[in-house]
Amino acid sequence: MKRTYQPKKRHRQRVHGFRKRMSTSNGRNVLARRRRKGRKVLSA
């Protein structure tokens, strides 16, 4: 059985990246929440 996680840099950025997060209001909520929590890394 093949493993489910087959990493691709482009896919990771496009789905979970900073610009993707900034492009929607909910994504901006995610970033704000992570800033409030004090995360060192905000997005992929």
Swiss-Prot record:
Disulfides per UniProt: none
Entry keywords, A to Z: Ribonucleoprotein, Ribosomal protein
Basic residues composition bias: residue spans: 1-22, 31-44
A molecular function (GO) term: structural constituent of ribosome
PROSITE patterns: RIBOSOMAL_L34
One annotated Gene Ontology cellular component of this protein: ribosome
Biological process according to GO: translation
Keyword Ribosomal protein: yes
The keyword Ribonucleoprotein is annotated on this UniProt entry: yes
Domain of life of the native organism: Bacteria
Region (Disordered): 1-44
Alphabetized HAMAP family for the sequence: Ribosomal_bL34
Family: Belongs to the bacterial ribosomal protein bL34 family.
Protein's name in the database: Large ribosomal subunit protein bL34
